[in-house]
Amino acid sequence: MNIFDRKINFDALLKFSHITPSTQQHLKKVYASFALCMFVAAAGAYVHMVTHFIQAGLLSALGSLILMIWLMATPHSHETEQKRLGLLAGFAFLTGVGLGPALEFCIAVNPSILPTAFMGTAMIFTCFTLSALYARRRSYLFLGGILMSALSLLLLSSLGNVFFGSIWLFQANLYVGLVVMCGFVLFDTQLIIEKAEHGDQDYIWHCIDLFLDFITVFRKLMMILAMNEKDKKKEKK
């Protein structure tokens, strides 16, 4: 039999029999909201780079934090759904604005870094998401404690590096942080499934978890590529 004559059963590939239909519908809403966030964040980054709207990174970070707290404090219901979607869009927009300075830095180093970092992040996110979806339920939830501990250590080392100013420690934080955030994609995806299976239908808040995972992976990968490119330019001189 010629292997090239075989037909691929895409329905079988996309069949998640271990996930209930209601949870699958919930995941569709989560990823639809995630796509909306990506579009709005891209618009926010573009607006910053063209108009330098809200130039101070602190203001955009503070604004996104306020919107996140507001969203968290607003209960999920049919009556508040439109309001919470608006808050989600505002949060995504300001997050995109906050990415502006990092994007400008990478463009100054090498404009090709941006599409490379985005495509790399998309591939990483897709692969780890599919791994979490196809894996046995709760198989990655044990990572929660490990990931939170690693995140705490990264935060402490980042604060310590403010005083030490070590480039080696900064680079180590980038690489280790990238690995940790890949783990969070696995953990958060399976946690969302478990929450949905137990009746938590707040797809807007679940979307924020995945959106922040994607943005953090993108930011770290972008900075790693930019630093590597700068090192290459130094070696050529």
Curated annotation (Swiss-Prot):
Residues 1-29, 74-86, 134-139, 188-206, 228-237 are cytoplasmic. Residues 51-52, 108-112, 161-166 are lumenal. One of its GO terms (biological process) is negative regulation of apoptotic signaling pathway. Keywords: Apoptosis, Autophagy, Calcium, Endoplasmic reticulum, Isopeptide bond, Membrane, Transmembrane, Transmembrane helix, Ubl conjugation, Unfolded protein response. Ubiquitinated by BFAR, leading to proteasomal degradation. PANTHER family: BAX INHIBITOR 1, BAX INHIBITOR-RELATED. This is Bax inhibitor 1. It comes from Homo sapiens (Human).
